[in-house]
Amino acid sequence: LKKIIMIEAYICDAVRTPFGKYDGSLSQVRADDLAALTIQGLLTRHPQLESIYINDVILGCANQSGEDNRNVARMALLLAGLSEQVPGTTINRLCGSGLDAVAMAARTIKSGEADLIIAGGVESMTRAPYVMGKAHKSFARNMEIEDTTMGWRFINPRMKAIYGVHTMPETAENLAERYSISRQEQDKFALQSQLRTSLAQENGFFKDEIIPVILPGKASDTMIFSKDEHPRQTSLEALTTLRPIVKKEGTITAGNSSGINDGASALLIASKIACDKYQLKPLAKILVTATAGVHPEIMGIGPVPAVKKALAMSKAKIEDMDIIEINEAFAAQALAVMKEFNIRWDAPHVNCNGGAISLGHPLGASGGRILANAVYQLHRQQGKLALCTMCIGVGQGIAMIIERV
């Protein structure tokens, strides 16, 4: 019998574009070009790597109905100048796609099928198209036109009958009611996200992960876009004036929800063999990843069973985590997850540099962002373990635990 050797998967680098606001600085950049920029950014930072050394490129993308169609990972790697011999695949676990792409890369490396993979995700929500279904018969006039920016489209009547069809804000409102999370609690959490991001920007905490984007300007002028543009100056007083978006007496507002954004992320995942062979410095080891399902009407609680599975797999406790990144789809959603684990709303180790409420949530790219932040924050604090978790539309959760190297 062959001796079984445990292969580890390491994060050796993590980059992303700045996140653009809806119809903002990245509105003129296609999703495949955005993803290509992060792939190029990784290789630029590691000039010893020839593109042919990359065994695969795995990207997450939630839309895939516009310019990000037909396997955006393959398109992006070719646009980035990688060898045509490098394969690429695109996966879709909606909001968790980017984190799942990294998990898929780690599993592939741990299985011994690859040594070096680029993984991450991309989303251009600004450029998400309207789509129209085909007529089911000649001269039919009942074709639906759907906005693909976010949420449901072409809903299966059976799905609607069995589970109902709740918008993302409605699912957050459901959690706010179920967990008795007040509007004030949500607004305070949202303000905290903005303030923490502002402080992180002032301290230059994002400079290690951001790849500047050169934007075309008038004539020969160009502009360098190098700072997230979704964060905003606000106050608790200003947040309290915003109207609820689900129902008149509701608590979910634009101010305590994540943004609609554009961006891309990419991480360099390697085996120990690849690290030694290509002189790559491991930053963190990917320990475990877990996914779980919940009822679609409370999709935001998905991280809870996913985190519990990940903790059981790693034989760790939530108290062992030095850094926790909970993707802030909504303040109510993040607070519900924190309540389940008895974590204070203002815990300093949770979303310590802000989250999706302040930075934005370009769906496929967000997993790479929270993972990059966790990696660099672990090193800044000299911590050991970090947990990254996200809720996922239609009722899922994903969680990953990493260890600083």
Question: What do the predicted segments below correspond to?
Answer:
Residues 5-29, 150, 235-301, 305, ...:
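Condensing-enzyme catalytic core mediating Claisen C-C bond formation in acyl metabolism
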Residues 16, 28, 32-37, 48, ...:
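N-terminal extracellular/periplasmic Venus flytrap/periplasmic-binding protein-like
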Residues 28-96, 100-117, 121-140, 210-225, ...:
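Conserved beta-ketoacyl condensing-enzyme motif
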Residues 61-116, 146-151, 162-167, 233-259, ...:
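Conserved catalytic cysteine-centered active-site region
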Residues 91-123, 176-205, 266-273, 338-339, ...:
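Active-site-proximal alpha-helical scaffold in enzymes
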Residues 116-174:
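Flexible glycine-/small-residue-enriched beta->alpha junction loops
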Residues 170-173, 206-209, 217, 287-358:
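Active-site pocket-lining segment
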